[in-house]
Amino acid sequence: MNTLRTVALMTVLTLLLVWAGGMMGGRGGALFALIMAAVMNLGSYWFSDKIVIAMYRGREVSSGPLFSVVQELCLRNALPMPKVYILPQATPNAFATGRNPKHAAVAATEGILQVLSREELMGVMAHEMSHVRHRDILIGSIAATIAGAISYLAHMAQWAALFGGFGGRDDDDGNPLGLLLLIIFAPLAAMLVQMAISRSREYAADRGGAALCGNPHYLANALRKLEMANSRQPMPKVNEATAHMFIVNPLRGGGLKSLFSTHPPVDERIRRLENMTVL
């Protein structure tokens, strides 16, 4: 059921991109957006891990406490060993990326190594490895890529509105209402779809992570510390299209950022974990 729901949401996201292309350029724009969606999905499949790691200037490691924890989890649960990266960020956070369990990467900030105990770090990495195990990372990467393209088209539409038209519509008068809907509705709709995909999979990864590390309290304690640290010191220069990939929401502030978070409430995640029996 969760797989069918995710497929449906990804279809909605792709159709939204096609609609945005149609609003910008008529039938030709819709066809271009459809081709772009196919190319972007293929690109996300093959290169999403490299793109996201490069975006946050990740450094691959083959030793140290983070590598040791990931290696222990993989050996204990017979999982393929992913590449391990450290991000030069003081704010504690982590994410996973890649196209499948054999071609995956996990990344954590320098700050997380200063804040969490080894058990808590194991809980966080178990959560990320659960994403890897269930291929959530590929779905999240594709969703982030398409949502970013929709936001880009909406930004272009703002300029089109300023200069009086679509520039490539089949009619001369254009469609001001369609342009307005694209500017306002498309980014919001893309964010809502991302939120729906991310929230259900975060709860599942929490459960899976607890199973992988053997103690749900490891992750519960880590989430409590991570949420507090990110509230006090938000991560700078976060790309909104990739925010859903992190274990806790790196975007902070009021308005839409808090109302339409791609992450479930941390308090609820902690409550569910603490109510789990030791596995």
UniProtKB/Swiss-Prot annotation:
Give the stretches traversing the membrane.
Answer: 6-26, 28-48, 137-157, 177-197
Q: Which domain of life is it from?
A: Bacteria
Q: What class of enzyme is it?
A: hydrolase
Q: Which cofactor does it need?
A: Zn(2+)
One Pfam family from the record? Peptidase_M48
Lipid bilayer topology = Multi-pass membrane protein
Per the UniProt entry, the disulfide pairs are: none
Active site located where?
128
Q: Is Acetylation set as a keyword in this record?
A: no
Question: Known InterPro entries for this protein?
Answer: HtpX_protease, Pept_M48_protease_HtpX, Peptidase_M48
What HAMAP family does its record include? Pept_M48_protease_HtpX (MF_00188)
**PANTHER family hit by this protein:** PROTEASE HTPX
Annotated protein name in UniProt: Protease HtpX homolog
Its ancestry begins with: Bacteria, Pseudomonadati, Thermodesulfobacteriota, Desulfuromonadia, Desulfuromonadales
